[in-house]
Amino acid sequence: MPDIMTTYTFLSAKPSIMNNKAPTSKRDQLFAELLTEPSQFSFNESVVDVFPDMIQRSVPGYPTVVRMSGVLSEQYAKPNTCVYDLGCSLGESIRAAEIALNDRDCELVGIDNSAAMINRASETLGSTSKINWVLGDVTAMDYAQSSVVIMNFTLQFIPIERRLALLTKIRNAMIPGGLLILSEKLTMPDPEMDALMINLHHDFKRSQGYSDMEIAQKRDAIDNVLIPETAATHLDRLASAGFSRTRIWVQCLNFASFIAVA
């Protein structure tokens, strides 16, 4: 496995990746007014309109995860294989991979089950990109031979009982030495530490301009939609799916990114 410090050095030497900016969007004010009829969170047109702002202000460390998805893809992607981004949303991670790979002979595929996300990603990048956009359920897909699979904050939205089967399917489609990048919100096994991380995350969101009402209403909307797990649970499941080596490469509060080698 390449040394992680090497990848940080490599990142500094790649200004094209560092300058891969998020798509512009409106400011996220979806929960700024009191909602008399709260609804379950979904990735609809309203969310898509503000998504780049929402995720930047809600997920600590998100820009680093996106940029390093490109760096790691450059180190692991092999010609004549696929590079997948599962739950690609607006395609920031797969676009970072495309820039990093610099016309390497790989098929780049972004998959999401939100038509609003896929349509916006396709419209935004248009003819400037060779990424193939697919609308579909990542748990129901058949995957071609792949060398890199990116899942940034996707598995947490999939029912827990379907997560192992999906990871096993991904592993079985990978070439030996292929890489999975798996980023997730975490829960902590120690209740006091879990409460601390949640409170610190809320403080982070306040520092980004969210009000207490916005934080509370977003939390209520996303409960039972986003189901976090412990880091140990993720590592055990990756081993059960057949990955040979796994580790957390970055963590910020209760958000972490894992790498797993096939």
Language model segments and positions:
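Conserved class I S-adenosyl-L-methionine
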Residues: 181-207
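Class I SAM-dependent methyltransferase Rossmann-like catalytic core
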Residues: 36-41, 45-66
